[in-house]
């Protein structure tokens, strides 16, 4: 299964690059006797549209059918990381400076705004206070919907 995921990642990465998109994640799993292949794509400059998902899905389906690396019948989905997307690296924090986020450390969970990122230090504003986190201190982070 790991080999399938790595092969699909390679193919999906090339397809995403053709459409000026980024590959965010690939998941291949069995749920209730059915196989699922989930491709999550991102656009570093804009939101992901249904057309983006459709383009990647059609091209990926065509390429996967040609090489036939997946032995089981599967359901293919292509989607965006979503509104509550995970923040997985310093680059994500830089990209989403000014946005509302949730940061979990070993000690606490904070909800606030990403204010600045310099040398792997994230400055975060929560309840009118500024807190600095080393990226390594963050156990989990994601964007939050700002209403």
Curated annotation (Swiss-Prot):
What does the organism's lineage look like at the top? Answer: Bacteria, Thermotogati, Thermotogota, Thermotogae, Thermotogales
Name the Pfam families on file.
DUF150_C, RimP_N
Point out the gene that encodes the protein: rimP
For this UniProt record, the keywords arranged alphabetically read as follows: Cytoplasm, Ribosome biogenesis
Domain of life where this protein originates: Bacteria
Q: What is its main location?
A: cytoplasm
Species for this entry: Thermosipho melanesiensis (strain DSM 12029 / CIP 104789 / BI429)
Q: What family classification does the UniProt entry report for this protein?
A: Belongs to the RimP family.
Q: Which PANTHER family match?
A: RIBOSOME MATURATION FACTOR RIMP
Its biological purpose is as follows: Required for maturation of 30S ribosomal subunits.
Write out the annotated subcellular location. Answer: Cytoplasm
InterPro entries recorded: Ribosome_maturation_RimP, RimP_C, RimP_C_sf, RimP_N, RimP_N_sf
| GO biological process, any | ribosomal small subunit assembly
Return the protein name. Ribosome maturation factor RimP
Of the GO CC terms on this record, one is: cytosol
């Amino acid at each position: 299964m790991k080999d399938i995921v790595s092969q699909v990642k390679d193919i999906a990465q090339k397809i995403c690059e053709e459409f000026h998109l980024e590959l965010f994640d690939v998941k291949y799993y069995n749920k209730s006797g059915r196989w699922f292949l989930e491709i999550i794509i991102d656009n570093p400059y804009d939101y992901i549209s249904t057309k983006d998902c459709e383009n990647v899905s059609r091209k990926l389906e065509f390429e996967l059918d040609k090489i036939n690396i997946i032995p089981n019948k599967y359901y293919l989905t292509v989607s965006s990381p979503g509104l509550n997307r995970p923040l997985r690296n310093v680059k994500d924090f830089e990209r989403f400076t000014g946005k509302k986020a949730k940061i979990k450390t070993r000690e606490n969970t904070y909800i606030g705004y990403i204010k600045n990122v310099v040398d792997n230090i994230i400055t975060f504003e929560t309840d009118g206070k500024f807190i600095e986190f080393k990226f390594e201190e963050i156990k989990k982070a994601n964007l939050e919907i700002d209403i």
